[in-house]
């Protein structure tokens, strides 16, 4: 195999929009329509799958360095989880530390501060990820995590806490976009789901740690000190990741975009230490093949024209709608209200240590995210969603019925000083447990696979758009929750979430294709005609058939 793999052959006649790409830096030629059908470049046969991808993927073996790389990148997920989960335990401890007892509105604004910051962090750092690079975008997120935690811990007024939460949110939003994007671009196809899932698992793990520390502090630490320490502890993992980022490489795709092909090759060699030089050259060729489309689009179109292209070009639009919809519906389930307001809601139910009770959904979520990420590459993203989302519907139906009878004596409202029926409180907690199990297996980690659906030239921006949709939905839920409990009651509030879950299930059924077994650069083909539910299955069948034929021939 030649080591100078810098020419990509055109698709055979009969293929869609024949394309010739010469990758040489001096003479890059791509037909005008290339970025209209990017990622459908140069197959070596008449099927949908590039044989080179099959050959290269089957040489992948996970190395100790790659495990280190994933572990460091996944700290971003832990930070995300800790800093979103700690507010539920910390807010009840604030008491009069800021000069007065926090009102429901102030609690909602403080809680929503991180979400608002995350919207800006996701949109700004996400869209700049190609220019900054994945690595530097994560470093900026770490600085935001650190600064936000310090500001909050040193606060003596509500506005100061809100500012700190906004800054912290920039880090959360940036991490939510960049970490799964970075991991997905580096991970072998066969284990990509588990690798991205490792970051997704660290989110609920961070929430468990936050709930556990919060429960301990509520039980034995003076409140006026405890809430400051809880927020301040977020500095530790952000500084650790900031220091370890020095040892992580930039994404090879970004290095090729910058014309640093030798650095990209060295990066691939370091990640895939067991691969031969020929396989590394083949991997580099594949990266160059898809990067060519990106450079063409960025060169030929202005930022405004590219932004317009995301919505006028149907394959781009379908991909963005698919991932944005799933991310938004994941928030509209209402799960995060159990984290943000765990201390408040379980306190209203009469439990003395609300933070300790909040460990129930946090621990269960972490456990079932771990199970989900362990099987996602074998079972598939779509199949998990189709199979287990109905369990969430059943659970919230139970929740609604339980809340109806629980709050009947108080006119449908949860009142702080009322002694509710112990069996009915247990029924509510049981329904929440039942809800968290399918949520952990589905939305909790699958929403973070968004980069799998997006072709390279819109991957960073598309991830930013979908994650922004996620945080906008989160904002609506978190800001409105306490007010909804007052106006609609618990029964009406969870009835609303049940409606969103049902609509989300219909969306997944028609608009969320399977990406299991397909490389991150192949999946863009799914959306050429429609949302590609059947096409994705066809691509996987053809890929498996070709791989079987290829390796049977070798034997």
UniProtKB/Swiss-Prot annotation:
InterPro entries documented for this protein: MFS_dom, MFS_sugar_transport-like, MFS_trans_sf, Myo-inositol_Transporter, Sugar/inositol_transpt, Sugar_transporter_CS
Transmembrane residue ranges: 62-82, 109-129, 143-163, 166-186, 201-221, 229-249, 329-349, 356-376, 386-406, 428-448, 462-482, 488-508
GO molecular function annotation: transmembrane transporter activity
Inducing factors: Expressed during growth on inositol and during sexual reproduction. Expressed during infection.
Subcellular location: Cell membrane
Keyword Transmembrane helix in record: yes
Keywords: Cell membrane, Membrane, Transmembrane, Transmembrane helix, Transport
NCBIfam families cross-referenced by the UniProt entry: SP
Protein name (record): Myo-inositol transporter 2
Gene name as annotated: ITR2
């Amino acid at each position: 195999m030649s080591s100078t793999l810098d020419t990509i052959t055109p698709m055979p006649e009969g293929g869609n929009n024949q394309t010739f790409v010469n990758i040489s830096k001096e003479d890059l030629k791509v037909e005008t329509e290339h970025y209209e059908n990017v990622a459908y470049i140069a197959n070596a046969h008449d099927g949908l799958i590039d044989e080179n991808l099959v050959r290269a993927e089957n040489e992948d073996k996970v190395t100790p360095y790659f495990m280190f790389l994933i572990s460091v990148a996944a700290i971003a997920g832990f930070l995300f989880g800790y800093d979103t989960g700690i507010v539920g335990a910390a807010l009840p401890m604030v008491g009069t530390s800021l000069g007065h007892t926090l009102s429901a509105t102030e609690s909602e604004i403080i809680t929503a501060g991180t979400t608002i910051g995350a919207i800006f962090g996701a949109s700004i750092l996400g869209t700049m990820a190609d220019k900054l690079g994945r690595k530097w975008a994560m470093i900026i997120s770490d600085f935001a995590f650190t600064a936000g935690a310090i500001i909050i811990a040193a606060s003596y007024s509500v506005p100061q806490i809100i500012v700190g939460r906004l800054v912290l949110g920039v880090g959360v939003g940036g991490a939510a976009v960049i970490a799964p994007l970075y991991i997905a671009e580096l991970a072998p196809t066969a284990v990509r789901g588990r690798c991205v899932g490792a970051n997704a698992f660290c989110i609920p793990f961070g929430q468990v740690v936050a709930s556990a520390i919060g429960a301990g502090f509520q039980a034995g630490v003076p409140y006026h000190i405890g809430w400051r320490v809880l927020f301040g502890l977020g500095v530790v993992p952000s500084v650790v990741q900031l220091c370890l980022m020095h040892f992580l490489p930039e994404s090879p795709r970004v290095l090729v975009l910058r014309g640093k092909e030798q650095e990209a090759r060295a990066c691939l060699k370091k990640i895939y230490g067991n691969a031969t030089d020929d396989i590394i050259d083949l991997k580099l060729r594949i990266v160059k093949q898809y990067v060519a489309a990106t450079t063409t689009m960025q060169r030929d179109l202005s930022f405004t024209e590219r932004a317009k292209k995301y919505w006028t070009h149907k394959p781009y639009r379908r991909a963005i709608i698919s991932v944005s919809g799933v991310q938004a519906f994941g928030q509209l389930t209402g799960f995060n209200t159990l984290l943000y307001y765990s201390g408040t809601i379980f306190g209203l139910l009469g439990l003395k240590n609300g933070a300790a009770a909040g460990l129930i959904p946090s621990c269960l979520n972490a456990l079932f995210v771990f199970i989900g990420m362990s099987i996602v590459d074998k079972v598939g993203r779509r199949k998990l969603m189709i199979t287990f989302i109905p369990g969430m519907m059943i659970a919230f139906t139970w929740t609604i019925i339980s809340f109806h009878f629980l709050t009947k004596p108080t006119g449908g409202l949860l009142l702080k000083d009322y002694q509710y029926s112990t069996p009915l409180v247990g029924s509510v907690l049981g329904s929440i447990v039942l809800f968290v199990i399918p949520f952990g297996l589905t939305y909790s980690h699958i929403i973070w696979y968004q980069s799998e659906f997006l072709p390279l030239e819109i991957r960073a921006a598309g991830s930013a758009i979908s994650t922004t949709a996620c945080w906008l939905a989160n904002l609506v839920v978190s800001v409105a929750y306490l007010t909804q409990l007052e106006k609609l009651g618990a029964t009406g509030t969870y009835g609303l979430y049940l409606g969103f879950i049902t609509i989300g299930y219909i969306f997944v059924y028609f608009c969320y294709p399977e990406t299991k077994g397909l490389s991150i650069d192949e999946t863009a083909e799914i959306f050429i005609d429609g949302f590609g539910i059947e096409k994705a299955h066809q691509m996987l069948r053809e890929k498996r058939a070709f791989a079987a034929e290829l390796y049977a021939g070798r034997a």
